[in-house]
Amino acid sequence: MLFLLFITSLACYGFGIILAKKARKGQKAIFFFAVVSMLFPLLALKYGGFAFSILGIPFTHSLVIPMGISFYTLQFIGYLADIYKNGQAPEKNFIRFFLFSSYFPQILQGPIPRFAQLSETLYQEHEFDGETISYGLQKILWGLFWKFMIASKAAVFVDNIFNSQETIAGSLYLIAGILYSFQLYADFLSCVFLSQGISLLFGVRLSENFAQPYLAFSIKDFWRRWHISLSLWLRD
């Protein structure tokens, strides 16, 4: 995972500098090539085996997909898009850029950070702040509570119903379906709390990524509330 992340970070860092130096006329081709290069590892690892089978080529190896690859791929594309579309200045220091790309509290479940937003707090000096540490620990405890006391408990009932070999009443399937949606909610919310809490221990506040999606009034509003940073990424 770290090797691929390092190589992809190095490529994105280089593309960012090249994009900024290139005249506007030549930027489009560079940007297109850069985006394809960022997507290639993700697509190759996720769909490489399927592509070989379609082509009739025997492929018996098991591809291991690194954790967080989807998030940091979108993060890199967003960084390059900000340089290409919005004229954002690229980061010239690779160590600082790699810190941005590999900041582990958000790399597994998001949010998908914008460089200008995360770098504001990531690169500044941090002093010990008891109040921030305390708030971070509260977030972590809430994350563990939602994961083990709610999501895991709901999963036991849901699995027992859907995996049962016996005849089950339709009402129980309905209840299991509702509980499954709540299980997904609790799972994602727990990850949000954990990533935010761990980041606060380092003095870095992550953006909100979850806003009570089950209170949405439309599918569009639901999606916007479920994964805020991804919705903003797609919009921009």
Regions found by a protein language model. Give the residues of each.
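Membrane-embedded transmembrane alpha-helical bundles that form the catalytic cores
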Residues: M1-D236
